[in-house]
Every structure is written in structure tokens, then in C-alpha cells.
Amino acid sequence: MSKPPSDPPRRPPAAFTYEDEATERHDNGRQAERRRKPESFSENIVVTADEDDPFLNPDKDLSAVPVATPLRRRTSFGKIAAGAFGILLSLGIGLWTDSLIRDLFTRADWLGYLALAVLAVGVLAVLALVIRETSGMMRLAAVQAIKAEAEAAMVETRPAKARAVVARLVTLLSANPETSKGRATLKATEGEVIDPPHLIALAERELLTPLDRKARALIVNASKRVSLVTAVSPRAVVDLLYVLYEAVRLIRAMAELYGGRPGTLGMFRLLRDVLAHLAVTGSIAVGDSLVQQVLGHGLASKLSARLGEGVINGLMTARIGIAAMDLCRPLAFHALKRPGIGDFIGDLTPSMSPRGNTP
């Protein structure tokens, strides 16, 4: 008969030392710090903002078109010389007109009175032209003044300046029926928004959203027309003349859309600012490199020569339209997204857009 198993022997109680794991790790870190060799570091440390960090913002468009700004008006010797010779020429024309009228009175009184009447009509027409050109230049200056005042009002703590800017913007766009809904919204919320940046952002969303949509349609239509004419035109000079015609037409339409309504001199100034911006940023680059840069090497090799030139000129027209939009828009892009060249590629080449690939 087997014996029942006996209980295992019990271990006598003993004392142990417990060391904190965090303290041990901390001590090891201190020892590692003590063992680290001395090093020298440069004091020229450049801190990159989060919004500019390409690792934090991988979708950031690094090739976006720079914002166009008006050129500074500076007095030059050329302007002084042109003004002096203009005054001299005006005096010569005045003396010639006086001599002509005197000779006509000598021949017959009715010829002299007829010349005086014609001169009066011409002077009145010139005065009307000067008034129109001055009004157009003043409206363009008002647009730039509103933009500058809005940028200054956004850093203020009191909403007085922001409300004044919004009031001026409403007055500028009051003749445009597409802003009626936005003006009604701003009037309904008057006094409720007291933060200057939010007030400017509200005005931008309510007043400029429909205008930006129409401006984009203007740019797309002009770019498509330029692409089509370039693809079918027999001569390069025809392409150049039509691109220039569409550029002037697009800039004028953009200025009128945002309340500028420039005259002839105002159009020359806007055209000069746009071309100067494109020349500085290197946006007027015509050749195979632009197609490969924007559309990709594979597609550029498959495009025909005329179609490739049409796409190039269409994209160049789109850049002109974006620059004109920057110059004519009464508020800078803050609450709304600024359009880029990539927004118009799908319209010029539907096969590249997602909707163009869907059956």
C-alpha cells in the first residue's frame, strides 16, 4: 500500500530589494549623458513654420504661381521728358489752331464760327475722355486701397477698421447683381461678428465667391479659345496676335468683374503690371519644357506639335488670367483657395482629369 504524497516543502520567507524601473532608466540616461563626448552646435538655427514644412504638408503645391502685386509708381527721367515734350506739343497745337481760326475769320466769318464750334466740340470730348480715364484710374486705386486696408485691419484688435473696409467693399460691388445675396447676408449679420479677421473672411466668402466662380469661367473660356486657335492657325504670328488679343480682353473683363472698370490708360497700366509679373516669375516660358513640367514627360512625347503648342498657349493664358485676378481682386485670398495652374489642366486636356477617364 503506497503512501499518500506529502506536501512540498515550504520556502522560508526572505527579504528582497525592489528598484524602481523608471529610476533605473533615468540613472542610465544620466550615465549616458555623462559618457557623451562634448560637441559644438551652430547657433544659426532656422525654424520652419508648420504650414511651410513639406513633411507636415505633403499636399502643399510648391510650384504654385506667385501672387501678382502692382508695381510701385516711381518718377523717372523718361516720364519727365515725356511730360515736358507733351506740354510743348500742346502749345504748338494751340498756336496752330489759333492761327487757323484767325485765317478762317479773315476769309469768311461763317468759316471762323464753324471752326470755333468744331473746336468747342473737340474740347468737350477731350474733357469727357479725361474724366472717364481719371474715374477709371481712381476705381483701380480704390481696389488696391481696399486690399491694403483689409490686410492692415486683420491685425487690429478692434473691428472698426474691418467694418469700414467691408462697407467700402459693399459700395464698390453694389452695382453687381451677383453680390446681392452676399450684401444681404452681411447686412443681416451686421454687428454680430466683432473679430476683424473673421469679419474680413465673411465678406470675402459672401461677396467674392460668386465673382471668383465667374472669373474662373472667364479664364477657362479664354484658355480654350487660345488652345483651339493655336492648334488650327497656319502661322505663329497669328497665335501671338490672338494670345495678345485674348489677354487684353481677359484683363479688361477681370477688372470690370471686380468693380475696376478701367479706361484706356488703366488698361495699359494693368497690362503692364501683369506682363511685368509674368516676366519676373518666368511664367512666359514657351517650349517643350513647359509641357513636360506641367503635363508630364510621357504625355508631352505623345502630343502632336500643334496640339502641344495649343496647350502651352492655353496655360500661358491661364497664368495671365490668374495674375489679372490677383491684381483686380479687392481682397487677397485668405478664406477662399487661390486658383493655380493645376486647376485648369483638366479643362484644357480632359483626358488628364478624373472625370475624363470615367466611362
Swiss-Prot record:
Renumbered residue ranges of the record's region Disordered? 1-43
Keyword Cell inner membrane assigned: yes
Q: Which residues cross the membrane?
A: 77-97, 111-131
User: Is Transmembrane included in the keywords of this UniProt record?
Assistant: yes
An example of a Gene Ontology cellular component annotation for this protein is:
plasma membrane
* Compartments it resides in: Cell inner membrane
- Where is there biased composition of kind Basic and acidic residues? 23-40
Pfam families to which the protein is assigned, alphabetical = DUF697
Write the record's keywords in alphabetical order, separated by commas.
Cell inner membrane, Cell membrane, Membrane, Transmembrane, Transmembrane helix
- What kind of membrane protein is this, topologically? Multi-pass membrane protein
Protein family membership: Belongs to the UPF0283 family.
Q: By its UniProt entry, which NCBIfam families does this protein fall under?
A: hyp_HI0043
What's the protein called, per UniProt?
UPF0283 membrane protein Rleg2_1967
